[in-house]
């Protein structure tokens, strides 16, 4: 049964499912239906689509080379409901705080919760795309620096997330970094102590020109 799962979903997808669906001190349930659901929602959508969209936009708007420009949302204030409009600060707070949260979960062997923290980072990246709307920024030439900052923030955030993911899904982490740092994937590897820092990526690094699909969506009926 385990070999069948690996043949269909791949080793890292099975790793993710088993680690994520086995709560601390409780029994877990493994089924084809749950595997497909997790594959599609978490791996294909939340993670795979995020990486693909970020690389595609980086290539479309900047030839693959996105840079820090300083055009951030500092001082953006709040909306009519009192919600912060400083999207950059909120994203960076989640990214730089994830390392400590993962450490705390792992100290008590709550592996599923540790992985959930990492995927919360990826979900926040997807929300950041919705908030900043890069496609709209691209239509305004005066917003070019802002667009570059947004895409840089996404690439940097994914880099941190991919490094945190390494112990749980090593092949996936390696594939992500190979796409974000194609000339030298090792450049994307961070020391664990640096995973609460933001902005370590150099400006002159290009992402891959041809992003690969990390996880394909599956149809349960097939």
Language-model features and meaning:
Residues 1-75, 183-206, 210-214, 218:
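Catalytic adenosine-cofactor/nucleotide-binding cores of aminoacyl-tRNA synthetases and other
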Residues 51-102, 126-143:
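Conserved, charged catalytic cores of large soluble enzymes
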Residues 27-32, 96-104:
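Short, charged/polar, low-complexity loop and linker segments
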Residues 79-81, 104, 108-110, 119-222:
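Basic, alpha-helical terminal appendages of large translation-related enzymes
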Residues 44, 48-58, 115, 119-122, ...:
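Short, hydrophobic, well-ordered secondary-structure elements
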Residues 5-9, 35-46, 87-95, 107-117, ...:
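Secondary-structure capping and boundary motifs in well-ordered enzyme cores
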């Amino acid at each position: 049964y385990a070999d069948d799962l690996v043949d269909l979903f791949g080793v890292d997808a099975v790793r993710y499912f088993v680690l994520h669906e086995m709560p601390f001190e409780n029994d877990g349930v493994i089924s084809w239906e749950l595997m497909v659901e997790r594959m599609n929602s978490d791996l294909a959508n939340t993670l795979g689509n995020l990486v693909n969209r970020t690389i595609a936009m980086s290539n479309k708007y900047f030839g693959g080379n996105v840079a820090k420009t300083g055009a951030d949302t500092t001082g953006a204030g709040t909306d009519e409901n009192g919600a912060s409009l400083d999207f950059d600060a909120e994203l960076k707070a989640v990214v730089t705080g994830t390392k400590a949260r993962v450490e705390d979960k792992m100290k008590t062997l709550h592996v599923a919760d540790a992985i959930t923290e990492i995927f919360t980072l990826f979900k926040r990246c997807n929300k950041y795309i919705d908030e900043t709307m890069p496609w709209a920024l691209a239509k305004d030439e005066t917003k070019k620096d802002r667009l570059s900052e947004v895409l840089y923030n996404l690439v940097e955030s994914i880099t941190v997330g991919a490094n945190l993911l390494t112990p749980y899904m090593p092949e996936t982490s390696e594939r992500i970094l190979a796409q974000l740092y194609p000339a030298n994937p090792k450049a994307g590897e961070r020391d664990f102590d640096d995973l609460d820092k933001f902005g370590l990526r150099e400006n002159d690094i290009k992402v891959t020109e041809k992003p690969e699909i990390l996880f394909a969506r599956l149809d349960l009926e097939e």
